[in-house]
Amino acid sequence: MDKFRMLFQHFQSSSESVMNGICLLLAAVTVKLYSSFDFNCPCLVHYNALYGLGLLLTPPLALFLCGLLANRQSVVMVEEWRRPAGHRRKDPGIIRYMCSSVLQRALAAPLVWILLALLDGKCFVCAFSSSVDPEKFLDFANMTPSQVQLFLAKVPCKEDELVRDSPARKAVSRYLRCLSQAIGWSVTLLLIIAAFLARCLRPCFDQTVFLQRRYWSNYVDLEQKLFDETCCEHARDFAHRCVLHFFASMRSELQARGLRRGNAGRRLELPAVPEPPEGLDSGSGKAHLRAISSREQVDRLLSTWYSSKPPLDLAASPGLCGGGLSHRAPTLALGTRLSQHTDV
């Protein structure tokens, strides 16, 4: 049980692990979808290629889009690309690294579908049965061109009366299936060789740029996630204070109207609504959340965060972004331990 808990915490704390898990899940779903798909070629001259190529390419496109939607870093990458520069310069290398990472994970499921379709051969036979050169097969010598086209269109349908138990149909189908499997295994081998070379040759080169881009791409993702969590915490605290303020104002209104008398005619004192002390949680890093206490301040803070990200320098002087909003991190006292989950 402890091992499962540690594994779950690892997936929670690592965005790359989550994205890799989603990538593997999409690949497994792709295999299941293809194995359960009912393939029915129309066996018509002008529709075989459309059906076969559509089945070969359309599901991979849908899986590619699903991979982009499931990957949170795709949205973070676009936001980093389109954000105003503000006080933080934009590094094209980080954006390229994030784009490469997103595309690699999004292309996994489409490649699985295409390779399965090529190794199975049904889509390829349906798509290219009408494009086979009849001169490669001796059985078409006594047929007219129209008969040859009709016969080739019926090749994927082995139960059709025109091609049932026909040696020519078996020869054409076997030829196309072998060609499809050869292409599938060639693509698989090329992908394995490319992955092997990338994995083995990468340590031979300078890793400085790679480590820097990987670090800052993770930073951009974690920064946005922590900002969202901090906004949620501030919204909760702000709502709590607004509710307390509402009850306090209602108490004052009840006092003004003289509605505090009990049934016996004596005056009843309403208990005071406790106001949140200003110094509450000052040592836990939450005191800075209470400085933003109006809708105008919240709107300005969010606008400033989008239009002018703070510089990546914690030693910079506060108030760089204008408006008196300081983006300087609160200083931690010596001996303070940082928990595994950041307190935001």
UniProtKB/Swiss-Prot annotation:
Which reaction is this enzyme known to catalyze? Answer: ATP(in) = ATP(out); Ca(2+)(in) = Ca(2+)(out); Na(+)(in) = Na(+)(out); K(+)(in) = K(+)(out)
PTM note says: N-glycosylated. Palmitoylated by ZDHHC3 and ZDHHC15. Palmitoylation positively regulates CALHM1:CALHM3 channel conductance.
Q: Where are the transmembrane segments?
A: 21-36, 49-71, 99-124, 177-202
Q: Which organism is it from?
A: Homo sapiens (Human)
Glycosylated residues are 142
- Entry keywords, A to Z: Calcium, Calcium channel, Calcium transport, Cell membrane, Disulfide bond, Glycoprotein, Ion channel, Ion transport, Lipoprotein, Membrane, Palmitate, Sensory transduction, Taste, Transmembrane, Transmembrane helix, Transport
Quote the tissue specificity entry.
Answer: Specifically expressed in circumvallate taste bud cells.
Lineage top rank: taxon: Eukaryota
Cite the PANTHER family for this sequence.
Answer: CALCIUM HOMEOSTASIS MODULATOR PROTEIN, CALCIUM HOMEOSTASIS MODULATOR PROTEIN 3
Q: What does this protein do?
A: Pore-forming subunit of gustatory voltage-gated ion channels required for sensory perception of sweet, bitter and umami tastes. With CALHM1 forms a fast-activating voltage-gated ATP-release channel in type II taste bud cells, ATP acting as a neurotransmitter to activate afferent neural gustatory pathways. Acts both as a voltage-gated and calcium-activated ion channel: mediates neuronal excitability in response to membrane depolarization and low extracellular Ca(2+) concentration.
Q: In the UniProt record, which is one GO cellular component term? A: basolateral plasma membrane
Keyword Calcium among UniProt keywords: yes
Protein family (similarity comment):
Belongs to the CALHM family.
The name of this protein is Calcium homeostasis modulator protein 3
**What are the annotated disulfide bridges?**
41-126, 43-157
Q: Which GO terms describe its biological process?
A: ATP export; ATP transport; protein heterooligomerization; sensory perception of taste
Spans annotated as Central pore: 9-36
What subcellular compartments does it reside in? Basolateral cell membrane
The record describes its membrane topology as:
Multi-pass membrane protein
